[in-house]
């Protein structure tokens, strides 16, 4: 951190790691000249749990419950990236019905993540009321998650080759009802947030990022699309079944905090369009590739597999999946940006290397540059518009 030696009246202030506006255990060392920000140094690592090293000592099946602790507000995406890697390494086909179920749950998770970004973001800039509104819709999404997966958070629902269970009876109708209701909720947000002059005063022209600058910093997700770059991995990589739906990439040219807000608000509407099309066109068939249940072929050939004693032992070994000796980078469009995994197999049931590319960690790097020469109160606005979760930043 560089502090000018000529000035004697500079103040160094610690923001966090226990401040409610830090969105987790983030610490900022801020150098102030009155109300003006001279420098800002983020201090990370308070929530580091060694997730990459844990992955290298677990099979994929054993590691699945861990990944929901990265971004604990969008756990479907961390599960999706964890099963997509082995599926591509092993050339495993996912049934069409399972792919549709995944897309529906991913978009519901995207909406839930954006909602829980919107409420605290508004609270950061002084508007407390929307915080209570967003929990009304978010609880409805969690009710749908609970009915489909058994858990409101930390679902552990995705499996290599499909999902853990089929959608329960009546779930599709309930989800369609939610979609119709939520569109009126988004219109309500537009009415009392987007057109609010005090809100516009706080976010318009604050934290501007140009398109070339966003690319140079490696930004992704709404941070990139709000700077005029139409880049969405759902369109670029053609994963799952997104090509079968009619939807548009949402983007803005301005690159400020207002643009990032507008991109996320409109993304929620696009997610509803995707969910409605998926629910109406969901095919029949299996929800899991049943051949993948045979993971360990040698064990299937072993006659002891069906022995009387094996059927009644209290603790059976978990199924294993041998990773072939090759490298693979797989990514998905998470609510915060590009969530990727660099996976190196070594003909073992354990990954030789499991490198996580978290969007929040990359997007956070531009914060010191954005807040320089801004006012102290603008730090909350800019940090809130980035949308970080420290679980995935520190891993």
From Swiss-Prot:
It is a peripheral membrane protein. GO terms for cellular component: chloroplast thylakoid membrane. Keywords: Chloroplast, Membrane, NAD, NADP, Plastid, Plastoquinone, Quinone, Thylakoid, Translocase, Transport. Pfam families: Complex1_49kDa. It is found in: Plastid, Chloroplast thylakoid membrane. Its EC number is 7.1.1.-. One of its GO terms (molecular function) is oxidoreductase activity, acting on NAD(P)H, quinone or similar compound as acceptor. InterPro entries: NADH_Q_OxRdtase_suD, NADH_UbQ_OxRdtase_49kDa_CS, NDH1_su_D/H, NiFe-Hase_large. It catalyses: a plastoquinone + NADH + (n+1) H(+)(in) = a plastoquinol + NAD(+) + n H(+)(out); a plastoquinone + NADPH + (n+1) H(+)(in) = a plastoquinol + NADP(+) + n H(+)(out). It is an enzyme of class 7 (translocase). One of its GO terms (biological process) is photosynthesis, light reaction. It comes from the Eukaryota. HAMAP family: NDH1_NuoD. NDH shuttles electrons from NAD(P)H:plastoquinone, via FMN and iron-sulfur (Fe-S) centers, to quinones in the photosynthetic chain and possibly in a chloroplast respiratory chain. The immediate electron acceptor for the enzyme in this species is believed to be plastoquinone. Couples the redox reaction to proton translocation, and thus conserves the redox energy in a proton gradient. NDH is composed of at least 16 different subunits, 5 of which are encoded in the nucleus. Belongs to the complex I 49 kDa subunit family. This is NAD(P)H-quinone oxidoreductase subunit H, chloroplastic. It comes from Coffea arabica (Arabian coffee). The lineage of its organism: Eukaryota, Viridiplantae, Streptophyta, Embryophyta, Tracheophyta. The gene is ndhH.
């Amino acid at each position: 951190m560089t502090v000018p030696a000529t000035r004697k009246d500079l103040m160094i202030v610690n923001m966090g790691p226990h401040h409610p506006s830090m969105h987790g255990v983030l610490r900022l060392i801020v150098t102030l000249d009155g109300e003006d920000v001279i420098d800002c140094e983020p201090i990370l690592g308070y929530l580091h749990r060694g997730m990459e090293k844990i992955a290298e000592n677990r099979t994929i099946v054993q590691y699945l419950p861990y990944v929901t602790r990265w971004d604990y507000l969008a756990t479907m995406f961390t599960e999706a990236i964890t099963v997509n890697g082995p599926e591509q390494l092993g050339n495993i086909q996912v049934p069409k019905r399972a792919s549709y179920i995944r897309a529906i749950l991913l978009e519901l998770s995207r909406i839930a993540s954006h909602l829980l970004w919107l409420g605290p973001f508004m609270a950061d800039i002084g508007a407390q009321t929307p915080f209570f509104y967003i929990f009304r819709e978010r609880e409805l999404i969690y009710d749908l998650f609970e009915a489909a997966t058994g858990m409101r958070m930390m679902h552990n629902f995705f499996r290599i080759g499909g999902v853990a269970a089929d959608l329960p009876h009546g779930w599709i109708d309930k989800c369609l009802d939610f979609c119709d209701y939520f569109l009126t909720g988004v219109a309500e947000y537009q009415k009392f947030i987007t057109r609010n002059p005090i809100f516009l005063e706080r976010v318009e022209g604050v934290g501007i990022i140009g398109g070339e600058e966003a690319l140079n910093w490696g930004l992704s997700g709404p941070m990139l699309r709000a700077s005029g770059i139409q880049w969405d991995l759902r369109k670029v990589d053609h994963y799952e079944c997104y090509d079968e739906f009619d939807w548009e990439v949402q983007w803005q040219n301005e690159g400020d905090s207002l643009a990032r807000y507008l991109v996320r608000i409109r993304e929620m509407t696009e997610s509803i369009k995707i969910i409605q099309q998926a629910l109406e066109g969901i095919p029949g068939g299996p929800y899991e590739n049943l051949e993948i249940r045979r993971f360990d072929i040698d064990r299937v050939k072993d006659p002891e597999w069906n022995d009387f004693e094996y059927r009644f032992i209290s603790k059976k070994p978990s199924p294993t999946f041998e990773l072939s000796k090759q490298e693979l980078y797989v990514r998905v469009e998470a609510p915060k940006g590009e969530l990727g995994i660099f996976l190196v197999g070594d003909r073992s049931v354990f990954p030789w290397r499991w490198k996580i590319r978290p969007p929040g960690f990359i997007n956070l790097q531009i914060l010191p540059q954005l807040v320089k020469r801004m006012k102290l109160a603008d730090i909350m606005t800019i940090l809130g518009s980035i949308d970080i979760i420290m679980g995935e930043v520190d891993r």
